[in-house]
Amino acid sequence: MNSRKDKNSKGKNSDTKRKKSSQENDKAVVLLSGGLDSTTCLYQALADGKKIQALSFDYGQKHKIELSYAKKITRQLGISHTIQKLKPELFLGSSLTQKSLRVPKNSLGKEEIPNTYVPGRNILFLSFAVCLAEGTGSNSIYIGVNAMDYSGYPDCRPEFIKTYETAIQLGTKKGNQGSPIKIVTPLQNLSKKEIVLLGNRLQVPFHLTFSCYDPKNRKACGKCDACLLRKKGFQETGVSEK
């Protein structure tokens, strides 16, 4: 009799664990800036059937206007959205955060890492995302990094993402218990043209995204790398931004 009860108890525990694991697999943290890439990434996570916690950062960036677009998108979708405020003093040496440094214009395609690179930004952003993912029982983090039509940032490369994912597995409770947090990079190997086409298929409201490093009076400058790449993507596809 006891043996039968033990078997039933083990069966129930196993079912409970499977149900919990399934629920965790349905949850994801999405890093959302409000730009074209991160918003397309958000819609890909939705298409993957994920229950999403969006995470954005206010770190004193010149293009903070993107956050207002992130708010619009998450409100429209009814998605939980956290904006984490960080001190600008943490991000020195970048033209995206320092008024004394000018954002490069019409310089797309140059080999060197541009001064729009923000030291340690993706490392820090992913660390916050890991905290949120583990705390909410999420098994994946979506980030819209891109290594094709990109500005040369080292923290957007596949090697960085792979290495960071290994660090997460080694340094978290979930990773040590055999339920590692995965970093999902759906745009990693896509050109800007392909990202626009993907966004179009996913029905991303492009008019609710903003891509500019140096906006003036809430309008895109049209000359920075972010503006030029966005323009290139839409021109090559013929897809409308509106």
Swiss-Prot record:
Keywords: ATP-binding, Ligase, Metal-binding, Nucleotide-binding, Queuosine biosynthesis, Zinc. Binds 1 zinc ion per subunit. Residues 1-25 are annotated as: Disordered. SUPFAM superfamilies: Adenine nucleotide alpha hydrolases-like. This is 7-cyano-7-deazaguanine synthase. Belongs to the QueC family. Pathway: Purine metabolism; 7-cyano-7-deazaguanine biosynthesis. It catalyses: 7-carboxy-7-deazaguanine + NH4(+) + ATP = 7-cyano-7-deazaguanine + ADP + phosphate + H2O + H(+). Its cofactor is Zn(2+). It comes from Leptospira borgpetersenii serovar Hardjo-bovis (strain JB197). GO terms for molecular function: ATP binding; ligase activity, forming carbon-nitrogen bonds; zinc ion binding. It is an enzyme of class 6 (ligase). The keyword Zinc applies. Its EC number is 6.3.4.20. PANTHER family: 7-CYANO-7-DEAZAGUANINE SYNTHASE. It comes from the Bacteria. Transmembrane segments: none annotated. Zn(2+) binds at residues 212, 221, 224, 227. One of its GO terms (biological process) is queuosine biosynthetic process.
